[in-house]
Amino acid sequence: IPEASPVACGTRKRVPEKKTRDILSASGKWEVTKEKARVTFPRVTELAGAIQTSDNVQAGFIWDSTAKQFGLKSIPLRELKNSTSTISANITTATKNPTWALRFARYLAAPEKGSPLFEKHHFTPIQGDTWVLEPEIVFYCGGVNREAVAVALKRFQEREGCLIKTQFAGCGTIVGSIQSGQFNMPDLFMTCDVSYMAMVQPEFTQPSDVSSTRVCMLVRKGNPKNIQTLNDLARAGIGIGTTDPQMSTLGALSHAMFEDLDIKQSIQENKSIIVTSPTAHELILQMEGHDKLDVALVYEANCQHLESNVEIIDIHHPLAVATQNIATARQSKFPHMMTRLKQEVLSTQSHDSFINHGFQWEGPDTGQ
C-alpha cells in the first residue's frame, strides 16, 4: 500500500486483524501498517462499508469474501498468500442432542445442500461429506481387533446417527477384496498389521497407528512337549496349528518366522502343521477342543479369556509383533465423518478397551 493511502483495520478483537497481525508480524511489516491505520471498526462489514462509501478510508484488511459481497476491488499481496481461515461448525459438549447437531453441521458443508449457498456468498467451500440423513459406513477390520474396537464403533454410531457395516476377516482376505476393484472399497480400513496397509496404501490416506500385539505359542497345561522356543517346533512328533498365511496376518507372520529361523523345511518334512484355520479364534477353539494339537501360534490379544488347560509361551523374535493401523479410503464419500471415527478409535475410552483386551497402545498419548 503506498504511504499516502489511508489504511483501516478491524478492531484487535476481530479475527481479520489478528490474522493480518500474525502474518505481517512474521514479515516485519505489522508495526508500520498499524501506524498508518486511521480508524478501526468493530465489525468487518462496517469496515467494508466505510471503504465503499467514505472519502477518508481508501483501503483496509478484510476477508476476500466480504470484499466480493460489497463489490470492492481486492489486491492480492504476497505476504497474505497463506492467510486463509476456516469456518467451522462446532458441537458443544453441553448439547442434549449431538446427533441432530452433527447432522446440521454435515448439512451446512454438504455439496448438495449448504455448500452452494456459501459459494453464492463468495466463500470457498470445502469438499464436504455427501449428504445422507443416516449414512451407511463400510468398515473393513482385521479380525484380531473385533472385541477391542467394538466399544468405539457402538459409541460412534449412537452419536453420529449412522450405520457402520463391519467386515471382520483376516487381512489377507480383506486386502484381496480391496484389490479386486472399487466396488469392494471400504470407507475405513483397520489392519491386523501395518504391512497390509502398505499393500493398498495408494487407495488410502496417511494411516495412524492404533495398537500392537505379539505372536505367542499356546501349549497344553504343563507343557508336556517342553516347547520353549520356535526352534523346538522343528522336532518330530509335534502337532502345530497356525492360521492360513494367505488369509491371515497371524499366519503370514508365523510362517515368516519359520523361514527366518530355517525351520520351515523340517516342519514340512515332519508334516507337523496339522491344523490351518482362517482365524485365530477358530484355531484356539481347535486347541481347546481337541488334543491333537500340541502348540498353536496366536496373538497375545487372543488369549484374554482362555481356559486353564493351556499355557502361553512367549516368542522372542523381531517378526513376532503386529502393529494395527487405520486409514480412510481416498474415494470415501464421508471423509470428514471418517476423520471423526478415527478420532473415536484413537480416544481415551478406546485406549482403555484395547488395553483391557490385551493390546499395547500405539496411538496418541491419552494421559493414561
Where are these regions (language model features)?
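Exported/periplasmic ABC-transporter solute-binding proteins
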Residues: 1-167, 172-186, 191-213, 219-368
